[in-house]
């Protein structure tokens, strides 16, 4: 049997303790079923295929929690399916007349109901008590899900890609539920320390940028009013830009979407003014304090029982990359960044355990080598493996130093425009254009690859490693899109291979995945072996896709994140 289903509960996953109703639709007969919960669960447990929207992260774990349900059949989550197939849906939504603004780019059932003409009626309820309207609402959700499943099915999408995304979604849900152990006490102490330093800097800046006193006169009586006093606010980008312009004639080179001067710690760090250094530190401290304590995604605000349970959307980008939120663990500063080491030390493991950090070596470079091998029989791969890729780039691009070559190379690899390359290597625009042209002329295999990829991109998509369609917005970003997607798909295969292998280790659990890196909590005695297995699984993932390059990785063992990456 094959069923589409939906449930209504009295709360979210961790708070609900009651399932009000379960509705099933037999997709072979079209029959809608509204049995009692026990009967419905038995049918789902015995089904060959169960289909639902966001069932991996909600419906199934709810039924497992409240009814100890076990499902033997295949699980198909339409949320996972739509995120894979319609990764560029936001662009299309903008072209639909009167499309609800709160649904643009969303993959909710409400949004999909609007797209496929099966509009969801909303009901007023606190979800605490069952009502007949609630059952009708559940039936409606089941119908929307069924029609959405048919839309997905008609696409005839790559089964390999679809299966991979479902496997990754399931293992990442386990990661989220387990959480990353967080040192709350240490985080609070760090926040206090940074706030104290911020107060010192604020006081110093008040002395540098004196209050602006403006005389005021009544327009009615002509009498003098109390002077207006504007106290300098070092956290205000508008105030900072205004004062720098007044004192030094500074003009912004970059602007925000609403036309205001763009100003952050990276821009301030490049200015020659003595106040810029203090302002730069002030901006940076504000950013770190927001990450730790004050911001909407602050770690301390999302800590639960000594752990951070960050959410991961496993396919949020057209390139198949994941995104992170509540809080964003993809933006924890690196150990080389200011206060980065102190921040990473907050993410740790329980006493007696170890953290194993593993990442793929030179991921984007290896993906480039794989695709270039078609045109140069592995010559560039040989340089990457046996020589020094940045020294080679220095020679090919005619740059002055290896450091410049490295900056140019990664900017080029990540899709940087000539303007961006010029900024990164500190060269005039025209010279940067010549350097890029020289690099491509001296590397004909890369030139041919770019031409081939741009030609393929004219149909609107590229074919990924697992036969998925990678949407391309424009030809100049096609190579970067291809390489990013290849890296993302490869890492997803790696996660699946690795998580299968560590099932035999008691208390071993992946706690975070960020791009080409994973962190694994485990017993101290198993740490080294798990690290070796993780690296072996990187190699295995490359072989799975028949890559023309050998892949590897490296691992580190510590008691916190600062020691493993």
Describe the predicted segments one by one.
Residues 1-8, 16, 21, 99, ...:
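Conserved "right-hand" nucleotidyltransferase catalytic core of DNA-directed polymerases
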Residues 18-21, 364-397, 466:
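Metal-dependent catalytic core segments for phosphate chemistry
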Residues 295-303, 314, 333-335, 357, ...:
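Short, contiguous acidic/charged loop-to-helix segments that flank catalytic cores in large enzymes
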Residues 530-538:
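Short amphipathic alpha-helices in soluble, non-transmembrane regions
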